[in-house]
Amino acid sequence: MAWPNVFQRGSLLSQFSHHHVVVFLLTFFSYSLLHASRKTFSNVKVSISEQWTPSAFNTSVELPVEIWSSNHLFPSAEKATLFLGTLDTIFLFSYAVGLFISGIVGDRLNLRWVLSFGMCSSALVVFVFGALTEWLRFYNKWLYCCLWIVNGLLQSTGWPCVVAVMGNWFGKAGRGVVFGLWSACASVGNILGACLASSVLQYGYEYAFLVTASVQFAGGIVIFFGLLVSPEEIGLSGIEAEENFEEDSHRPLINGGENEDEYEPNYSIQDDSSVAQVKAISFYQACCLPGVIPYSLAYACLKLVNYSFFFWLPFYLSNNFGWKEAEADKLSIWYDVGGIIGGTLQGFISDVLQKRAPVLALSLLLAVGSLIGYSRSPNDKSINALLMTVTGFFIGGPSNMISSAISADLGRQELIQRSSEALATVTGIVDGSGSIGAAVGQYLVSLIRDKLGWMWVFYFFILMTSCTIVFISPLIVREIFSLVLRRQAHILRE
């Protein structure tokens, strides 16, 4: 099979300027910091659970019984764990609602302002939730719930904005590998959050929240002063003009002069007034775009599984194998390593095939087997890390593809070429649908684990992964059929 022209000529890197590199790094690390603050919460669940239970259940507390018992939130660690699962669900529901709103807002306001505001405001909320309440010894369930709802809404500004900015700077050529590598930002953020939390956890869980919130706030300031949301801001041509030029350069000029007028606008420089006339599409129009609904439903199932590992993996390792919380935090990094490798490699393969769905289908089928294998992992850290990496490769990889490269494809398809302000809205729909599924899943995970045990949690993951394949099965069949026809045409030409 012939490789795409961008790989044949080695022209992918030659398209990029230092502005592309800066945008790549700024958006990468901005979302990494947002994810690091989320990961902190999952990494300190055991410590929080101990702090919220009375001393009769918590022998590590040094305070007098009378003082501690007057401040505890829950009568047992099981009740505290269930509330932590509820907080995950609350966060994800508010995050999902916020994604739908943030996508629409991002297509209508300056993406840099929206992203910077979300990062700085979220950092303040995380600081109050984890550090300030502990320093003041003020424990209140309703306050925690309200803070986590607000945090979910503020964090939701991140993903639609960074994907839209990346979509403004990087065209369809090589998008799978570029976005596959870039989508590792979430996994890098998980690793960063795990490392930061484990490094200061010995001083108290509140310091884990303090460190990540401080770094995230500083990142928001950098974004406000340093991010360019589109090439047009510095007088460069947009990616639509580059893609049109690329397509035109491969068309045979057989019609003589009558094509010149048709193609001439592709080489002209648009003034500011023409750029300003582009309007954002409506939410309903974005939902009706081909592929948006199937991928949204599929991502609802897949993000449920991926985020269950994100929220519960350190707790599972500590609870199921009896490993120390700091050790479990560090070991959970291997799931994200697998996701980084999987997203990049699968994105590259999808670029070579010029199709996304068949690559997703194969990876998800193998994900079912990896879940079965990991559910039977022995109490050995090396074997567990290996199986965890494989599981992250086949689950985290497809999740990264859908949320980044595929969302960018959907937001820049031919039907909306004259309405380029759709990328943030489409990304918000896909990721918002995924977050709704993930929100429901986090409560179900805690409930299933409490009633039936961890093995049934893995059965639930297998079911959701299978549903992901079912929802995109029409796209899989269509794209495989297209590959077969293309292969047959290639054979006939030879």
Curated annotation (Swiss-Prot):
What are the glycosylated positions? N58, N266
Purpose of the protein: Unlike the other SLC37 members, lacks glucose-6-phosphate antiporter activity. In osteoclasts, forms a transporter complex with ATRAID for nitrogen-containing-bisphophonates (N-BPs) required for releasing N-BP molecules that have trafficked to lysosomes through fluid-phase endocytosis into the cytosol.
Q: Which UniProt keywords apply?
A: Endoplasmic reticulum, Glycoprotein, Lysosome, Membrane, Sugar transport, Transmembrane, Transmembrane helix, Transport
PTM remark? Glycosylated.
| Pfam families noted in UniProt | MFS_1
Disulfide topology: none
Give the GO molecular function terms: xenobiotic transmembrane transporter activity
Assembly, in brief, is:
Interacts with ATRAID; the interaction is direct and both proteins are mutually dependent for their stability.
Name the chain's protein: Sugar phosphate exchanger 3
**Where is the protein situated, by its record's location annotation?**
Endoplasmic reticulum membrane; Lysosome membrane
Provide the family line: Belongs to the major facilitator superfamily. Organophosphate:Pi antiporter (OPA) (TC 2.A.1.4) family.
A GO CC term attached to the entry: lysosomal membrane
Q: Which Gene3D superfamilies match?
A: MFS general substrate transporter like domains
